[in-house]
Swiss-Prot record:
Belongs to the somatotropin/prolactin family. Pfam families: Hormone_1. This is Prolactin. One of its GO terms (biological process) is positive regulation of receptor signaling pathway via JAK-STAT. InterPro entries: 4_helix_cytokine-like_core, Somatotropin/Prolactin, Somatotropin_CS. It is found in: Secreted. Keywords: Disulfide bond, Hormone, Secreted. It comes from Chelonia mydas (Green sea-turtle). One of its GO terms (cellular component) is extracellular space. The keyword Amino-acid biosynthesis does not apply. SUPFAM superfamilies: 4-helical cytokines (SSF47266).
Length: 198
């Protein structure tokens, strides 16, 4: 759904409405990324011992994110908003390359479709979050916080095991980060829209 009808002048969607959309979208992205990870895990990762290698290998690990709800509640909403933006921005490149490189994997039609959908929806969520930040802190240019990704060569390795592990790790991280964003947005909505009464 477009935020405003095309050609509408001075259209302003309420903050509550923007948060509703952002929370729905982030929930959708998280459920898609979980499905994609689970399908990939079942089809390609069985018996390869990927999980034991995948711990703490996410490119967004350099962004300090709260580990649980209690920690997240200690963070000022402005910092939490910027953190969500930073994590979303950090996924722009990897998602773009995931969409093109996943097509090299044999018999992965479902994964390809989900990757394309996630990449599109992630862009929408980032746009929505920029609108939210613009309303919460008008006129303030948020810092360009993000974590660069250098994993493209690993998605293009000739060795199939290494290449599949690189995909596995990326999908594992996407599921992890989309879950964090989903939780942070619910927390922010509760705090900024419902005055913590939820």
């Amino acid at each position: 759904l477009p935020i405003c009808p095309s050609g509408s002048v001075g259209c302003q969607v309420s903050l509550e409405n923007l948060f509703d959309r952002a929370v729905k979208l982030s929930h959708y992205i998280h459920s898609l990324s979980s499905e994609m990870f689970n399908e990939f895990d079942e089809r390609y990762a069985q018996g390869r011992g990927f999980l034991t290698k995948a711990i703490n290998g996410c490119h967004t690990s350099s962004l300090t994110t709260p580990e649980d709800k209690e920690q997240a509640q200690q963070i000022h909403h402005e910092d939490l908003l910027n953190l969500v933006l930073g994590v979303l921005r950090s996924w722009n490149d990897p998602l773009l390359h995931l969409v093109s490189e996943v097509q090299s994997i044999k018999e992965a039609p479902d994964t390809i479709l989900k990757a394309v959908e996630i990449e599109e929806q992630d862009k929408r969520l980032l746009e929505g979050m920029e609108k939210i930040v613009g309303q919460v802190h008008p006129g303030e240019i948020e810092n360009e916080l993000y974590s660069p990704w250098s994993g493209l060569p690993s998605l293009q390795q000739v060795d199939e095991d290494s290449r599949l592990f690189a995909f596995y790790n990326l999908l594992h991280c996407l599921r992890r980060d989309s879950h964090k964003i989903d939780n942070y947005l619910k927390l922010l909505k509760c705090r900024l829209i419902h005055d913590n009464d939820c």
